[in-house]
């Protein structure tokens, strides 16, 4: 392993100071509360910005010998946050960290002979298996100065405190709603994500003095965000093309605020007066339209883009293939916002989702005419060969894309074909394995396109036929060996309804007796 240089050491320490929460899952964020520096034998006031610059400077250019940092660790669950002190010692290439809590042990990091030297009273496993790998990674990482900082627009401590309060007030009841509605989606992900977004919006509105008279959440889905904001005293409404089971479980006020209605871009009108904020929370096809609709109404908006779409409702066409598809789409929506005349703010939320970048339009330029906005929209639709009449967003009936809508004769034909391919790949007729690519190459274009339009591809088809096929790792597909019912968990046992595939189609028949098999012989 290459020796760690002094510049790399201080780079790692600079990241550590601001990112201790990356080493401790119980900590939400680090907030620096005070910085002083040691200069010419005196202690002087300083700042987090000066500290960051000094850590990057060449040693010969530094004007101080070290810094003392006061910080606060924001706890994810505990009511009280934890205070700490960090000491940067440039002369001895040393960083020490102590905490005003018995629950976290202090430590020190030094540089000696090109290696990190780590010390603590007793927590040696944490030093070696958590801290050291992170320091090595941070010392070699390239810093992206343009990267959007998480929660950069809000007071992080206020946000964390409110988020904890919202979880205490709402999470248990919402979990019960989820069970009652028999929702198939992950309740913890959706509940905690929308509680985090609600906390963010409430703190943002308070800080920017832009609290809404009323808001409208377009494409509100399960209505969870609308419900929480309503419960916290913020008047607002949710629109979605399709009513969800959860809607009927919310309090009457929230139920009246959830509107089953298609948001058609060229004809949409709000049903209630006073709305001065639009919200797009993973609003899919509506995402590029949100700044346009807000611009037409001359109001603020908050957008958390997710799946990429054109204004026409078609799948998003890449503009810049040098970056990720998500970043490309985010840049496109940012451009749309500029064309709508907004002064744009960006932030990165801390939510259980990979799509965390938020776009906010809080102030619209008075000089931007609505005619310019409409011209831009028409040009975009023309460029991508979609006129007004062809704008097509989501259907009211959600399409099912899991192969259950494909003609049964097509499914059966594909299953038999793939089954025979694997069967013939080995003499014993049971242990054959074929790569997914080889199976796909053996199918015709018509066969592949027939299932791709409905379920996204052959993999879903094979998963749905789990009683016949199995995934063997390394992209290999095999024939599943039938297991006796006696070896199956009770929860997996069902009343026999279907004929045994192997009894009917395997040249050696089913290896199980009728009593042992899960299917009818």
UniProtKB/Swiss-Prot annotation:
<comment type="function">
    <text>Probable adenosyl-L-methionine (AdoMet)-dependent tRNA (uracil-O(2)-)-methyltransferase.</text>
</comment>
<keyword id="KW-0949">S-adenosyl-L-methionine</keyword>
<dbReference type="GO" id="GO:0141101">
    <property type="term" value="F:tRNA(Ser) (uridine(44)-2'-O-)-methyltransferase activity"/>
</dbReference>
<keyword id="KW-0963">Cytoplasm</keyword>
<comment type="similarity">
    <text>Belongs to the TRM44 family.</text>
</comment>
<dbReference type="Pfam" id="PF07757">
    <property type="entry name" value="AdoMet_MTase"/>
</dbReference>
<dbReference type="GO" id="GO:0005737">
    <property type="term" value="C:cytoplasm"/>
</dbReference>
<dbReference type="GO" id="GO:0016300">
    <property type="term" value="F:tRNA (uridine) methyltransferase activity"/>
</dbReference>
<dbReference type="GO" id="GO:0030488">
    <property type="term" value="P:tRNA methylation"/>
</dbReference>
<protein>
    <recommendedName>
        <fullName>Probable tRNA (uracil-O(2)-)-methyltransferase</fullName>
        <ecNumber>2.1.1.211</ecNumber>
    </recommendedName>
</protein>
<keyword id="KW-0489">Methyltransferase</keyword>
<keyword id="KW-0808">Transferase</keyword>
<keyword id="KW-0819">tRNA processing</keyword>
<dbReference type="InterPro" id="IPR011671">
    <property type="entry name" value="tRNA_uracil_MeTrfase"/>
</dbReference>
């Amino acid at each position: 392993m290459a020796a760690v240089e002094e510049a790399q050491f201080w780079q790692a320490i600079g990241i550590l100071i601001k990112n201790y929460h990356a080493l401790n899952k119980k900590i939400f964020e680090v907030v620096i509360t005070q910085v002083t520096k040691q200069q010419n034998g005196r202690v002087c006031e300083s700042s987090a910005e000066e500290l960051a610059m000094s850590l990057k400077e060449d040693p010969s250019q530094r004007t101080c010998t070290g810094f003392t940092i006061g910080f606060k660790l924001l706890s994810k669950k505990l009511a009280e946050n934890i205070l700490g002190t960090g000491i940067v010692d440039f002369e001895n290439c040393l960083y020490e960290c102590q905490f005003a809590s018995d629950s976290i042990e202090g430590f020190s990091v030094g540089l000696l002979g090109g290696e990190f030297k780590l010390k603590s009273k007793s927590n040696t496993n944490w030093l070696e298996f958590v801290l050291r790998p992170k320091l090595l990674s941070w010392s070699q990482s390239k810093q992206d100065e343009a990267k959007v900082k998480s929660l950069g627009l809000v007071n992080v401590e206020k946000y964390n405190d409110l988020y904890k309060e919202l979880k205490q007030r709402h999470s248990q009841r919402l979990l019960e709603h989820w069970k009652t509605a028999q929702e198939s989606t992950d309740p913890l992900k959706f509940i905690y994500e929308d509680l985090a977004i609600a906390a963010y919006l409430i703190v943002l509105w308070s800080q920017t003095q832009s609290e809404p008279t009323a808001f409208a959440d377009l494409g509100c889905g399960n209505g969870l965000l609308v419900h929480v904001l309503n419960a916290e005293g913020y008047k607002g409404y949710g629109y979605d093309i399709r009513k969800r089971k959860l809607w009927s479980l919310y309090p009457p006020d929230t139920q009246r605020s959830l509107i089953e209605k298609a948001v058609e871009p060229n004809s949409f009108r709000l049903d209630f007066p006073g709305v001065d904020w639009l919200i797009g929370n993973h609003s899919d096809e509506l995402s590029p339209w949100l700044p346009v609709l807000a611009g037409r109404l001359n109001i603020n908006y908050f957008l958390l883009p997710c799946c990429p779409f054109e204004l026409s409702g078609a799948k998003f066409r890449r503009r810049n293939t040098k970056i990720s598809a998500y970043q490309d789409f985010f840049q496109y929506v940012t451009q749309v916002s500029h064309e709508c005349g907004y002064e744009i703010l960006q932030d990165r939320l801390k939510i259980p989702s990979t799509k965390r970048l938020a776009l906010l339009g809080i102030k619209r330029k008075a000089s931007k005419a609505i005619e310019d906005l409409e011209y831009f929209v028409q040009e975009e639709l023309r460029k991508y060969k979609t006129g007004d009449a062809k704008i097509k967003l989501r259907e009211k009936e959600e399409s099912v894309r899991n192969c259950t809508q494909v003609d049964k004769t097509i499914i059966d034909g594909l299953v038999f074909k793939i089954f025979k391919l694997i069967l013939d790949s080995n003499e014993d007729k049971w242990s054959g394995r074929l790569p997914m690519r080889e199976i796909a190459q053996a199918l015709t274009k018509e066969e592949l396109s027939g299932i791709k339009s409905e379920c996204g591809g052959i993999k879903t088809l094979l998963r749905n036929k789990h009683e016949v096929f199995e995934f063997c790792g390394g992209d290999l597909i095999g024939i599943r060996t039938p297991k006796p019912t006696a070896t199956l968990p009770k929860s997996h046992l069902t009343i026999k309804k279907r004929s045994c595939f192997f009894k009917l189609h395997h040249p050696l028949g089913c290896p199980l007796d009728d009593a042992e098999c899960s299917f009818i012989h």
